[in-house]
A protein has these predicted regions:
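Sec-dependent N-terminal signal peptides
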Residues: 4-13
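Periplasmic c-type cytochrome electron-transfer domains
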Residues: 16-285
Length: 285
């Protein structure tokens, strides 16, 4: 009995150490310039900035559903959420871009996205007197492509979702998660989910060779964040699964060979629901 108590104590201690070392809570909104972010929000939803004037950033990253990346699909890939993306240090599908502003530039000019050019964006902005006045008020050099990217960057910085129940738990509030949710977190670690989904965004900052069993490819892809996962369906890079429970089951059966049972899957599901943070204030403005 004494040995069992000691063993349980060691396991509890190791769990606490892992929790503290590989997960980082978001306890407050990342600082951003409100004027620039408000301007960036306008640019984000403006279809006139795309080559054929039919799509905007918001076409794929719908603000009405919290920029979760679940809007109309115009590419073969499942658009990722923009919530908390500013906290990442690698970007793009394969993680080759190391800077948020550079990712925005790519999204604006890529023929698979807005498919526009720097000069076209500047000309479209200059056609709108309200835009021109706002740029001159915020930036000394007025309307430039770099300033447009800067405004969009500030808007995306504003899309943090702090203080999820998991964040509160990490910060020391042991009552923030129920007993089942804590067991789900333990199972999440036990089965190696945290080996990819870790850090401040529980993913988003490492790349992995995806297994054939899941997505039929050996591509090196960026691991997605699990924050707000209950809001960001569909799942996987091509959006093949529409329900979170089904995504968990697919991983259980194909990666872990069914090692954990349905009860543990349900506990992990309950834990993942605790990753939903506060809606960014700028989405109400």
């Amino acid at each position: 009995m004494i040995k069992l108590i000691l063993l349980l104590g060691i396991i509890t201690s190791l769990f606490a150490q892992i929790k503290d070392e590989i997960f980082i809570p978001i306890t407050q909104q990342q600082p951003y310039n409100r004027q620039k972010a408000a301007l960036g929000k306008e640019l984000f939803i403006d279809k006139r900035l795309s080559k054929d004037k039919t799509i905007s950033c918001e076409t794929c990253h719908n603000l009405e559903i919290k920029a979760t990346g679940t809007s109309d699909k115009i590419t073969k890939d499942n658009p990722p959420t923009l919530l908390n993306v500013s906290l990442n240090f690698i970007f793009s599908k394969k993680g080759e871009i190391k800077n948020l502003s550079e990712q925005i530039k790519k999204s604006l000019t890529s023929d698979k996205e807005l498919n526009t050019q720097e000069s076209f964006i500047i000309s479209q902005i200059n056609k709108n007197p309200k835009y021109e006045a706002k740029f001159k008020n915020i930036y000394k050099d007025g309307v430039t492509f770099e300033n447009s990217v800067d405004a969009l960057t500030e808007f995306i910085k504003a899309l943090n979702t702090p203080l999820s129940r998991f964040d509160k738990f990490l910060a020391g509030d042991k009552t923030a998660l129920s007993e089942d949710e804590q067991k789900g977190f333990e199972a999440f670690i036990k089965y190696g989910c945290a080996s990819c989904h870790n850090g401040i965004n529980l993913g988003g900052n490492i790349i992995s060779v995806m297994k054939n069993e899941i997505i039929n490819t050996n591509e090196i892809l960026k691991v997605p964040t699990l924050r707000n996962i209950s809001l960001t369906k569909p799942y996987f890079h091509d959006g093949r699964v529409n329900e979170l429970r089904d995504a968990i089951e697919m991983i259980r059966s194909r990666i872990h060979s069914g090692k954990h049972d349905e009860k543990e899957c349900e506990l992990i599901y309950k834990f993942l629901l605790t990753l939903e943070g506060n809606t960014p204030e700028i989405l109400y403005e």
